[in-house]
Regions:
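Short, flexible helix-loop junctions that flank or precede catalytic/ligand sites
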Residues: 1-265
Length: 265
């Protein structure tokens, strides 16, 4: 297929720990894996890479189907379909059709409503591996979002295998990056996330830089988007059980989810 594109899971920018956990998750035979993050953060790319990893392991022996809005890249050995709401081909309708075909792996472009969520969770409970995205303010807030869709907490507890949050940051322009001193609160946050030893290493050996703006970057101070910041929750995390049962504001969770990795190719 000349329009097919290969996505390499090892080039997503995940650190070794997160990459192995992600591979472990997509290697499971059943359950629901969710990716969350803003538009353009790389969620779909990560899912395509996950499907590529499954195909690399099993070839076309595993039946994979997708419902997308729209299909962003053609994938070999994957039965892909695009939504067509004008003709009634919505996420719920498409998923019901897919369930009759009995695929082993199902990619759902996005869980947007209660009906889609119910079908995806039911598929994850009945012998399918479902990989999808959902818009949420945070990784832990994914559970509150699904509960607000009237999904029963016990269903989430038994179905969700893991949640991966993805963010992309812009890198400094290499032509105008100059040394600078971050504000005290930023240094304190870095100290809390990474520890005093890591912070001191940055100060002593690398320093901090900020793009001043030049003609090469159209005076923005930034280059291209290449820096990924990730956090993840897996079935083993205590916070999954807590998040499912938490009734308060997701932004007030007493747990803090710190980035699992940062990568700058």
């Amino acid at each position: 297929n000349p329009n097919a594109k290969t996505f390499d899971i090892s080039r997503l920018g995940f650190d070794d720990v997160t990459l192995e956990k992600f591979k472990e998750l997509v290697g499971k035979p059943t359950g629901l894996i969710l990716l969350t993050g803003p538009t353009g953060s790389g969620k779909t790319t990560a899912i395509y890479a996950a499907i590529g990893f499954i195909l690399e392991k099993h070839g076309n022996a595993v039946a994979i189907s997708s419902v997308e809005d729209p299909v962003e890249q053609n994938l070999d050995w994957v039965n892909q379909s695009s939504l067509n709401p004008a003709r009634g081909y919505t996420y719920p309708a498409a998923l019901r059709s897919l369930m009759r075909q009995d695929p082993e792996v199902i990619m759902v472009g996005e869980i947007r409503d209660e009906e889609t969520a119910e079908i995806a969770i039911n598929a994850g409970m009945t012998g399918h591996l479902v990989i999808s995205t959902i818009h949420s303010g945070s990784t832990s807030g994914t559970f509150a979002r699904l509960i607000n869709m009237d999904i029963e907490p016990f269903l989430l507890a038994s179905t969700i295998m893991g949640v991966l949050g993805v963010r992309l940051l812009r890198t400094n322009c290499m032509h105008c990056a100059t040394p600078y001193t971050p504000e005290a609160y930023a240094l304190e946050q870095l100290r809390q996330f990474e520890g005093e030893e890591y912070l001191q290493m940055l100060i002593d050996q690398q320093g901090f830089y900020k793009g001043a703006g030049c003609s090469a970057c159209s005076n923005t101070g930034f280059a291209r988007v290449t820096h990924s910041v990730l956090d993840h929750l897996s079935k083993e995390h205590e916070i999954i059980s807590f998040g499912i049962n938490y009734q308060g504001d997701p932004h007030d969770y007493p747990f803090k989810i710190y980035p699992a990795s940062t990568h700058n190719p």
